[in-house]
Amino acid sequence: MIRSLSIIICIMAMVVSCKTNVVEEQKIELKNQLIGLTSAHNARQLGGYQIGNQRIKDNLLLRSAKLSGLSGEDSTLLADKYKVQCIYDFRGEKESLSAPDVIPGKARYLSLALSFGGEESGTDTKFENEEQMIGMLLQYADHPSVQAMCTSMYDVIFFEESSQEVYRKFFADLLTVQPEDGAVIWHCTQGKDRAGSASAMLLAALGADRELIMADFILSKVYYDPMSSKIKTETESQKTVINTLISANPVIFEATLDKVDAKYGSLRNYLTECIGVTPEMMEVLRDRYLE
C-alpha cells in the first residue's frame, strides 16, 4: 500500500514537472508590441515574442512605417529610450528621396532600396495626399498592373534576385550590430510588406515557427484595418486592392510562404540558400537577441 502510494506520488510529481516545462500558448496583441510613437504608423517591436523556452529581448528589434514625419518627441524617444543605432530603409530610392527619414540621435542610416515595378520603370505617380492615392487605387483596381501587385507582391520580395540581394545586405549588416549598444529599426513606407518580410525572415532565423511569423504579420492588418474599413468600395477588385495595399493581406503573404516551403523545405532553408544566412549566423542572432 505504501509502495503504491509512493509510485502515485512519483507519477504526480512527474506530471507537475512536465506541466511546468510546457511553453504556454502566447497571446499576440498589438497593444503589447507598440513602441509609443505617435508620428510613425505601425511602429512596434519583436521583443517579448516567445520562441521555444526563450523569448526575444525587449526594445532591440523595432519595425515601423516611414520615419519621414517623425516628431521631435518621437525622435528623442527612439534616441534615448531605445538607443536606436541603425535605421534600415527598404523604400525605393524615389520614395526615400521624396520623403527622407528623420534620423534620431546619432543613428546610422542604411538605404536598402527595394522597389516595385512602377518606380523602377519611371512611371510612378506623385500624390499630394493619401486621399488622392486611394482614389487612384479605387479607379484602377481592375488594371492588370494593380491586380498583379496584389497577387504577386510577396513573390517578388522572396523570389526575385534583386530583392534577395537587399535582404542579404540587411542580414549582413545586422550581424555587425552589437545589441548592447542599442536597438535597430527597419521600415518601408507602411511597415507591412517589405519591412514585414524582413521581420518574417528574422523571426525564422531566431527559430520562430509559422504560427508566430503569421501572428506578427497579422498585427499590421490589425493596425491598418480601422483605417481601411472607412474606405468605401463597390467591387471585389476594389476590396482586394484596399485590403492588400492599404491594409495587410495575410492570405496572400502565407501563400508565398507556402511556395517558399514547397521549394526550399522551410523558411530557414530559404534563408541559407537564397539570403546566405547560415545556421551559424542564425545561432549568433539567437545568442544576441533571445533570453
What are the residue ranges of the model-derived segments?
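Cys-dependent protein tyrosine phosphatase-like superfamily
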Residues: 18-185, 197-291
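Ser/Thr-glycine-rich phosphate-binding loops at phosphate-binding pockets of nucleotides
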Residues: 190, 194-195
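Bacterial Sec-dependent N-terminal signal peptides
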Residues: 1-23
